[in-house]
Amino acid sequence: MKCEIEVGKPDWRPLENAVPSEFCEDFMFMGKAGGIVLYKHRITRRYLNIDAVTGKFYRYANGEYVEIGRRQALDSVYDHDQ
């Protein structure tokens, strides 16, 4: 899925549904790509991309957003060795 990034009013609901509330402050809202909300982790600088409606997770690869599982998405954000 290819989408242009739009920056506007932050939507924190997808993130709040995906991670414990104490971890939400570790992320910055970066914008939206279609229905996918983009968050960047303040320390690892990695993205957590979450569909605003379905809560599904995506990674950006080769110019497209590709659906991945929740565990893979969270591991990619928090794994400092990647």
Sequence positions of predicted segments:
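Acidic, low-complexity, intrinsically disordered interaction modules
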Residues: 17-71
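Mixed-charge, Lys/Arg-enriched low-complexity segments
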Residues: 1-20, 60-82
